[in-house]
Amino acid sequence: VPAEELVNRIGLDGDTNSITTRRLLFLLECEWLYNEPAKRAFFDELIANYVTENVTRDSIARFLVNDVIRYYRTISVDFEIKTREGRAKAWAPRRLKLVFSRKMLYFGGIIAAAETAGFDYVGKRAKLSELLQLPPITRLQTVFGDKSLAALELYDHFLSRLNDPEIRQRL
């Protein structure tokens, strides 16, 4: 998918599930492998598309929130169809990924957008750029500090259990 399609098709008829998924994964969990300046420029262009000059100080980055919600709905519907009876995809591992890992990604996006309240559009863009550059878990730690520890310890326990070959076999 060309980069301009990720930016210019948000919410339009041509904004397919594939484009939405790639755009949101880029925003919510992207790590650069090379050419950081180009990645950064595209990242900032994408954020500017979500937060225009018309966004008020009192609001949050609502357009981004709506797209994050749409992305989560998309993967939830995809999960349902891919795990119906007769499909080859395994139900339990997919469900666990959706319930925990994808919700972490989703919540991390919503929290980043919520943190933009009180800023003008320039400040909102800067706050999103700062927070969305962080991995979702680090993002939650940054926003919530020590209040996030208990939940993140439980999440760590879940991930360690999910990586246990014996448990995975039983799933």
Briefly describe each language-model feature range.
Residues P2-L6, T16, Y34, G118, ...:
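General structural signal for secondary-structure boundaries
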Residues A38-L171:
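Conserved nucleotidyltransferase catalytic core and NTase-mimicking acidic/glycine-rich helix/loop elements
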Residues V1-L27:
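Metal-dependent nucleotidyltransferase catalytic core
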Residues E31:
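Short conserved active-site loop signatures built around small residues
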